[in-house]
Every structure is written in C-alpha cells, then in structure tokens.
Amino acid sequence: MVVVSPKMANATPNGSVPHNHVGAVLLTIPTIKIDGKQTLATEDHTSIDYLQRAQWLRAAILGANDGLVSVASLMMGVGAVKRDAKAMLLAGFAGLVAGACGMAIGEFVAVYTQYEVEVGQMKRDMNMSVGGERDLEMEMERRTLPNPLQATLASALCFSIGALVPLLSAAFIENYRTRIIVVVAMSCLALVVFGWVGAKLGKTPK
C-alpha cells in the first residue's frame, strides 16, 4: 500500500513539487493506453511451469495421435476384408481398449524409469553427505521431475479420445467407400487439431 503525502495536492500541473514542500515524495506509476484511455500498468505474476506441463503434454499428444492413426488403420484393414460397418466398429473398439491399456502401462514404466534415473543421479551428485536427505528433498522440489501417474492418465485418456474420431466417423455411414473416405478425412483433420492444441498448451513460439 502506498501512502501519499497531502502536500502532493499542491503539485504543479507539470508534475513538479514546489520548493517549500521538501518532504513530499513524487511517485511515478507507469500507465498504458488502451483505446485512448490511461490505465494502470500491472504485471502478470501468474507463472506456469511449462517444463512440468511438457511432461504430460508429450504423453497426451503421443497418445492422441497413436490412438487416431492405429485405430483408423485397423478399421480400414478389417474393412478391406469384410465391408461391414459392424465388423469395422468392433475391431476399432477392441483396438481402443487394448491400445489405451498398452499406452498406459508402457508410459508408466517408461516415465517411472526416467524418474528413478534422475533421482539416482541427483543422489550421486550430492554424495548423500550429512543432511543429504533434506537437501535431496529440497532439490526434488526445485527441479522438474517427471510424474509417472500424470503421464499415464494423459496417455490413456488421449489415446481413447483419438481413437473415438474414426469410430464415430464410421458409425453412421452404410456405404463402404463413403465410410473409408470420411474416416480418412476426419483422421487427417484431427491430426491438425491435435497439433494445434499441443502448440497452444505448450505456448510454442509462432
């Protein structure tokens, strides 16, 4: 909170203070113009750790693209053998369940291994001297370590979302040729959307 001396009320229009008001303090508050009006300039103190976000964002984008491409390819492969919408949908749903489970397990093992390697390296660097446990906890809080559970949930959920695109695209189309065209078109469009979402969430430079 800023307290302004009452003597400042006698300041001249150009912002200077008369000599007889020696004790007055002139504070300059930066302003910015918005639509021709002067407004106070404020700083955005909201800080987001994008390195931490990148841990689950990588798993999410990978899972979404994998679910989209793998399930769409599986459905088109089954459709080439049997041009039946029901067979394609059953194959796609089976691919969704199996793929989501596989991505979740694989992501958890991979990220947890990375977590253990980084923690082990931190212990070796600190030599675990006297007070090393406390220093290790402080260092772990300071550094951005991977979160296995977060990456697992992001990967499985986004794989399912990606797999739903070809499934929903083919669910209501009877003609085989039209069904394949719609699945391919929607899959290509979804790839662009997933890439755009990843760029926006990651705040990548334009």
UniProtKB/Swiss-Prot annotation:
Reaction it catalyzes: Fe(2+)(in) = Fe(2+)(out)
Name the organs or tissues of expression. Answer: Highly expressed in the fixation zone of the root nodule. No or low-level expression in root, leaf and stem.
* Localization (cell): Vacuole membrane
Q: What is the effect of changing A54V?
A: Reduces the efficiency of iron transport
State the annotated membrane topology for this chain: Multi-pass membrane protein
Pfam families with a match to the protein in the record: VIT1
Segments passing through the bilayer: 61-81, 89-109, 153-173, 180-200
Superkingdom per UniProt: Eukaryota
Q: Name one GO biological process term.
A: nodulation
Q: What is this protein called?
A: VIT-like transporter 1a
* Predominant location: membrane
Q: Name one GO molecular function term.
A: manganese ion transmembrane transporter activity
Cellular component GO terms held in the UniProt record:
membrane; vacuolar membrane
Which residue spans adopt a coiled-coil conformation according to this UniProt entry? none
**Origin organism of this chain?**
Glycine max (Soybean)
Which UniProt keywords are listed?
Answer: Ion transport, Iron, Iron transport, Membrane, Metal-binding, Nitrogen fixation, Nodulation, Transmembrane, Transmembrane helix, Transport, Vacuole
Q: Please state which protein family the record places this protein in.
A: Belongs to the CCC1 family.
Please report what switches on or represses expression of this protein: No significant changes in expression observed in response to short- or long-term iron deficiency in nodules.
- What does this gene product do? Vacuolar iron transporter that is required for the accumulation of Fe(2+) ions in the fixation zone of the root nodules. Plays an important role in maintenance of symbiotic nitrogen fixation activity, for example during symbiosis with Bradyrhizobium japonicum.
Instruction: Show the InterPro entries listed in the entry.
Output: Ccc1_fam
